[in-house]
A protein has these predicted regions:
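Bacterial N-terminal signal peptides that target proteins for export
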Residues: 1-6
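C-terminal motif of bacterial Sec signal peptides marking the signal peptidase cleavage site
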Residues: 15-17
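Bacterial signal peptide processing site
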Residues: 19-21
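Kelch-like beta-propeller repeat domains
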Residues: 29-340
């Protein structure tokens, strides 16, 4: 298994910083990507990839899952249908980690922003969209940050929301931006302290975005709500300070779920296997008979058709990347792929 190194919450890749802002091309780049037929294939071991539900494909898409940063390969997207994984793209923009991605339900496109390409030496400020057939690089002026960003789709505004990250000089940024398919717009530079490895999900029932935890100046348990273009901090006693965890919103039961993560800045020695649920303003620790192992940075998403929370991968206390798939059915965790 591939091993990784984290100091604090920053990844140690190389001495090179982020690149300067990506030059704006005169014409968009268009890359055909759709495989002729779905290819049944398990994703590689990876951590902190995005797991996003695509309503047209009726799949949970695993985005920014990179196994070997020494290889220069195009970005691959895998889809989970509840029984098996399939590779749904072949070809596309360069693979990357720690970028932001979101699915725009109104326009039916997957959005990809920033991240570190797999040479790990530079980050970029590219904006790409995938319409299910082709990737198109958008000709736009980008946000300030270039990686360690998080994105969600805000159905109320019809725009995708991006928060935090590192700028090209590797300064932490606490700006909030929106993407409408044509341009990026800065909405705020106040609110939560800049951070990395936090939870960021959309709550459609209350038309708001939820931010929990992460590593700011230290591991935090802050809870923030983005609604009506403004941040508000709220407090619900619960999991405590946490970073590198998985978080997903169950739209069927209107509940927020958190799994795994690190409870201190000593990331690998402080991993947990706890499952928490927040419903109606109250946190509760669940006690299932079976559970995924202790891990950091698992991918976590919700399938609204099958009404299942899905967890994929992450890393363990020995710094090994993981490749198992688990589902939460509302009562228990069940391992469905690469079980040990």
């Amino acid at each position: 298994m591939r091993k990784i190194l984290i100091v604090g919450w920053f990844l140690i890749f190389s001495t090179a910083g982020c690149s300067s802002a990506t030059p704006i091309a005169s014409t968009p780049t268009i890359l055909p990507t759709l495989a002729p037929t779905p290819i049944l294939e398990n994703p590689p071991p990876c951590w902190e990839a995005d797991l996003i539900y695509h309503s047209q494909l009726q799949l949970l898409l695993l985005v920014n899952c990179v196994e070997d940063p020494s290889k220069e390969t195009p970005l691959t997207i895998w889809g989970w249908d509840g029984m098996q994984w399939q590779r749904v793209t072949q070809g596309g923009p360069p693979a990357r980690i720690l970028g932001g991605s979101a699915y725009d339900e109104k326009r039916n496109v997957l959005i990809l922003y920033g991240g570190r390409p797999i040479d790990l030496g530079k980050c970029n400020q590219e904006t790409w969209e995938w319409d299910g057939k082709t990737w198109t690089q958008k000709v736009v002026t980008p946000p300030t940050a270039c990686d360690h960003v998080k994105m969600v789709y805000d159905a109320a505004s019809g725009e995708s929301i991006l928060f935090s990250g590192l700028d090209p000089s590797e300064n932490l940024i606490n700006e909030t931006w929106s993407w409408n398919g044509e341009e990026w717009k800065k909405l705020s530079d106040t609110g939560p302290e800049s951070r990395g490895h936090f939870g960021f999900v959309y709550d459609p029932g209350h038309e708001q975005t939820l931010l929990y935890g992460g590593y700011a100046s230290t591991v935090t348990d802050e809870f923030w709500v983005w609604k009506d273009n403004a941040w508000q901090e709220v407090y619900f006693p619960g999991p405590g300070p946490l970073s590198h965890f998985g978080m997903a919103y169950d739209t069927d039961s209107n509940a927020l779920y958190i799994f795994g993560g690190a409870i201190s800045s000593s990331t690998f020695s402080s991993l947990t296997d706890k499952t928490w649920i927040l419903r109606e303003g109250s946190w509760r620790e669940l006690a299932p008979e079976n559970s995924p192992s202790r891990r950091g940075a698992p991918s976590m998403g919700f399938d609204p058709i099958r009404k299942r929370i899905v967890v994929y991968g992450g890393f363990d206390s020995n710094r090994n990347n993981l490749a198992d798939t688990w589902e939460w059915d509302g009562q228990q965790w069940v391992c469905l792929s690469n079980c040990k």
